[in-house]
Amino acid sequence: MANVTVTFTITEFCLHTGISEEELNEIVGLGVVEPSEIQETTWVFDDHAAIVVQRAVRLRHELALDWPGIAVALTLMDDIAHLKQENRLLRQRLSRFVAHP
């Protein structure tokens, strides 16, 4: 099965995610998303960036956070997800050595 990556120009990305170009510039500056390609005059974004921005927009509407707050919240949420995954793997390793009654 082939991997397919969808890419968006700035205009397409803004239309797809519902944000303005100014907001896109701000969230790129904050590191919320990064362009997958930087061409001479424009950025190109992949489908993963669109998912992250849609998640950020949802946080903005539901929690009334500003973009810097959203950047922090997304970072913390990603850290939590990684820690949960690491915890799950460590528990699996530990269960091999601990006798269950």
Swiss-Prot record:
Transmembrane segments: none annotated. Pfam families: MerR_2. It comes from the Bacteria. Disulfide bonds: none annotated. Interacts with CbpA and inhibits both the DnaJ-like co-chaperone activity and the DNA binding activity of CbpA. Together with CbpA, modulates the activity of the DnaK chaperone system. Does not inhibit the co-chaperone activity of DnaJ. Belongs to the CbpM family. This is Chaperone modulatory protein CbpM. It comes from Escherichia coli O1:K1 / APEC. The lineage of its organism: Bacteria, Pseudomonadati, Pseudomonadota, Gammaproteobacteria, Enterobacterales. The gene is cbpM.
